Amino acid sequence: MAKLQITLTRSVIGRPETQRKTVEALGLKKTNSSVVVEDNPAIRGQINKVKHLLTIEEEK
């Protein structure tokens, strides 16, 4: 299964609590922090909720 590298490029300051919790659930804490996660429908749904705050790259 493919992996995704997710980077938090925008701050969560001033964002609704649901978006903050979603970013935290993805494993991101600070701006410019990155995580590598499995590509599955649950992760894609979380990414879709906060896509305006993230940069997503597909790993090989």
Swiss-Prot record:
Record's protein name: Large ribosomal subunit protein uL30
Keywords: Ribonucleoprotein, Ribosomal protein
Assembly description: Part of the 50S ribosomal subunit.
GO biological process: translation
Native organism taxonomy: Bacteria, Bacillati, Bacillota, Bacilli, Bacillales
GO molecular function terms listed in the Swiss-Prot or TrEMBL record: structural constituent of ribosome
Gene: rpmD
Gene Ontology terms: cellular component: cytosolic large ribosomal subunit
Pfam families found in the cross-reference section: Ribosomal_L30
Record InterPro entries: Ribo_uL30_ferredoxin-like_sf (IPR036919), Ribosomal_uL30_bac-type (IPR005996), Ribosomal_uL30_ferredoxin-like (IPR016082)
Similarity annotation: Belongs to the universal ribosomal protein uL30 family.
Signal peptide: none
Classification via PANTHER family: LARGE RIBOSOMAL SUBUNIT PROTEIN UL30M, MITOCHONDRIAL RIBOSOMAL PROTEIN L30
